Every structure is written in structure tokens, then in C-alpha cells.
Amino acid sequence: MTDSALSLLGLALRGGSLAVGEEPVREACKTRRAALVLTAADAAPGSADRARRWAQERGVPWVRLPWDKETLGGALGRSLCALAALTDRGLAAAVAAKLVRADEDLRPALVSLLNEKKNPRAKQKPAVPET
């Protein structure tokens, strides 16, 4: 399951829906584009704390991933990656679902995205009635 989550992160990067690195993640949170903030298992404590704080300030789910910086970076075509933020809500929900399937302990942190995945129309605007 987690390998497919890594694949989705690579797809998000290629599609321009993944902010990678401390400054891009901070900016994605600040501009309210971040849908899910991720930190590598071995991210520096200060970096992980900042990412968590940025996410919490904006009500964005945050999770520490089961992969180290090298594994996460390798999936993204980089040598290392400690912080990332998905900016596409659909991809964020898909990654959240895969992470929870692999580790049920992540469910509380990702419940808002999992609920969106179950009911994708809940966030859509209602149809305008014809007149």
C-alpha cells in the first residue's frame, strides 16, 4: 500500500500538485493551497515542528510519514526530501486513504480527507437550478 502512496506523490509532483521543501511547503500553507502536509520519518525536529505548526494554523491535516528522507526523496526524483505538501485535494485524499490502509494509527490525523474521499460531492457547490 505505501508503495502506491509513494507513486501518487511522484505523480503529484509531475502534475505540479506537490510543494517540496521547507519554503514551498510554508508558502502552500500560508496561501491556503496545502491540502495535506507531510514530513519524513527522520525530518529534523525543528523542520517537522514548523511544518506541523503551519498546517495546524490553517486547519490542514499533517502527518509524519513512515519513510525516511532518502526514500521519500527517491520517489520524487531527488536525493532527499524532508517536507512536502499536496495541493490537490483529490490526490491528498487518495494518499491519505493509502496511508491509513497501511497504518490505521494515522486515521485520526487524516479523518477530514478520508471523509472527503467517501463523499467527493460534499465539497462541490450545489447545482444552479434552471430558470
What are these regions (language model features)?
Residues 4, 46, 67, 90-94:
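Charged, alpha-helix-enriched surfaces in structured cytosolic catalytic cores
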Residues 4-39:
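N-terminal first-folded block
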Residues 8, 20, 97, 128-131:
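Long, amphipathic alpha-helical "stalk/connector" segments that mediate intersubunit docking
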Residues 23, 42-43, 67-70, 89:
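Short, ordered loop/turn segments at secondary-structure junctions
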Residues 34-36, 41-53, 60-61:
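N-terminal positively charged helical leader segments and presequences
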Residues 57-83:
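Mid-chain, well-packed structural core segment of small domains
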Residues 73-115:
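C-terminal structural segments of small proteins and small subunits
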Residues 112-131:
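Charge-patterned, long linear interaction tracts outside catalytic cores
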